[in-house]
Structure formats: structure tokens, C-alpha cells
């Protein structure tokens, strides 16, 4: 997502020409080279899903989700946080559902996790962002009269309303268990 974000930031200067003065060209290069040095996102996604999550039956992931659920408890009963806690709750549930389905079907369809690893990685990334946005909004709301804190709530709201909908698409793809895909090859 870093590479994508850098490329989208570059578009702000569309038509400007060479953007060296703003430093964004270096960010675009750095974000791309990091993917080359660190390995492809797909390899990282497969490693996350198969070696780290599937290998222990999702136990460590459940520990992580328990941390995310603490934020739900911290924001419970606060009407100003409902948008954020609802979004986080939805992402936690989607993550649990996806892992449960993948674990239940791993013997019948061992390649399923390979086909959806990238979508799972991105979905989990959005679940973590939903947690960060909920936490950020909760921390900023008591001081929202200050413009800096108000901007934090607005940024979190932007994330939930504008960026988080992609998570639904990612989780749909994970859950589809597209049985047609193996037949194509």
C-alpha cells in the first residue's frame, strides 16, 4: 500500500511536469525499491497466512484480535465513537470469519490460502487500520476543540469512510473460495 499511496500522492502534481522540488519522486522510487528488496507482497502474504496464521490454527491471530477488541471496549458507550467502533467490529468479525473458513477447508482445498493470500493480507491490514483510526479518534475526541485534534478525528473519519470500504471487497474475495480458478489453468 505504500507504493500505491506514493503513486497517488504523485498524481496531486499531475500536469506539473518534473516533481523533484517536492520530494515525491524520491518517495515513489523508495517505496518501489523496498518491495524489491523485501520481497514481493504476494510472498509476504503467503508467509503471513500459511506459516504464521494457518500453522498454529490462528492462535496468534486470535491474540491480536483480542487486542483490537480492547479498543471496542474502550470506546463502548461513546456515541461520538460509534462510527469507528462499528467499523472496527465489522473488520474483526470479517477477519475471524475468513480465518475460520480457511482453516475449516484447508484439507479439502489446500491451495485456497495461496489464491487469496494477498487479499487476506490487505484485509487484515485494513482491520488494523480500523483499530488505529478508532484509537486515534478516541484519543483525540476529548480535545477536539483544538484544531490539531479535530484534524485527527477528521483523518480517522476519512479512513473509515473513504479507504475502509476496500476491505469489504478483499474479504469478499477471500470468502469466495473461487473453485473455478484452479480449472482455468
Question: What function would you assign to each model-found segment?
Answer:
Residues 1-63, 147, 158-184:
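Alpha-helix capping/hinge segments and adjacent helical runs
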Residues 67:
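Short acidic/histidine-centered micro-motifs embedded in hydrophobic/aromatic stretches
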Residues 52-55, 70-185:
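C-terminal amphipathic alpha-helical interaction region
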Amino acid at each position: 500500500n505504500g507504493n500505491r499511496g506514493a503513486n497517488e500522492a504523485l498524481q496531486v502534481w499531475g500536469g506539473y511536469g518534473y516533481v523533484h522540488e517536492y520530494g515525491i519522486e524520491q518517495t515513489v522510487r523508495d517505496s518501489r525499491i523496498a518491495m524489491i528488496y523485501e520481497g514481493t507482497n504476494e510472498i509476504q502474504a503467503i508467509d503471513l497466512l500459511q506459516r504464521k496464521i494457518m500453522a498454529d490454527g490462528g492462535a496468534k491471530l486470535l491474540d491480536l484480535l483480542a487486542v483490537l477488541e480492547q479498543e471496542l471496549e474502550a470506546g463502548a458507550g461513546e456515541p461520538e465513537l460509534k462510527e469507528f467502533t462499528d467499523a472496527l467490529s465489522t473488520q474483526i468479525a470479517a477477519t475471524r470469519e475468513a480465518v475460520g473458513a480457511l482453516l475449516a477447508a484447508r484439507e479439502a482445498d489446500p491451495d485456497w490460502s495461496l489464491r487469496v493470500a494477498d487479499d487476506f493480507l490487505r484485509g487484515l491490514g485494513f482491520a488494523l487500520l480500523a483499530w488505529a483510526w478508532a484509537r486515534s479518534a478516541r484519543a483525540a475526541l476529548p480535545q477536539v476543540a483544538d484544531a490539531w485534534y479535530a484534524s485527527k478525528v477528521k483523518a480517522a473519519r476519512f479512513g473509515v469512510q473513504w479507504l475502509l470500504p476496500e476491505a469489504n471487497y478483499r474479504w469478499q474475495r477471500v470468502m469466495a473460495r473461487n473453485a473455478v480458478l484452479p480449472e482455468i489453468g
